[in-house]
């Protein structure tokens, strides 16, 4: 059976860009479990069945672990989005960024970025209206999955990443997505960190100190 999520992404990849193997396997896991919805010709993939998540939501808690949606707009829409984001029409931007996920309800995005050495990295584009985190999310696909398995409500908030999930007793309690966590651990024979900052070094939009993040350095050069 065709993996529609993966085909959508492959159809809009920048030249020279590769889908990390771990992301390919995640998309297959999503398709195999039926964790997707089709709307207006686009397939959206999730880490947890959406109806079950909605049904579990109360004033105090919910199921499902990290909320993130995987999708791929057309290349034309991708180009428009990144041009608007950076305020720059230079092909240097559209030829190196491919948005593949929404990381926050306020519009933050996850993207594949082609670095100067031709390697594909996973980066974060904060919406600016909520999250202002603009940095590398993971150097590789496995670390991205490990980050998702920690169990934050969303991975777009830099203030949350140095702390464990559910550290604030006054906030909604997010029950961990144990099936996804177990799949990551068992499939890749890996462990899940306790804190997001074991993987991510958050950087804010406009911050000139790159903290050794080549994506931040590149973003600071191309933004207008």
Describe each region flagged by the PLM.
Residues 1-116, 181, 189-224:
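A surface-exposed partner-binding patch
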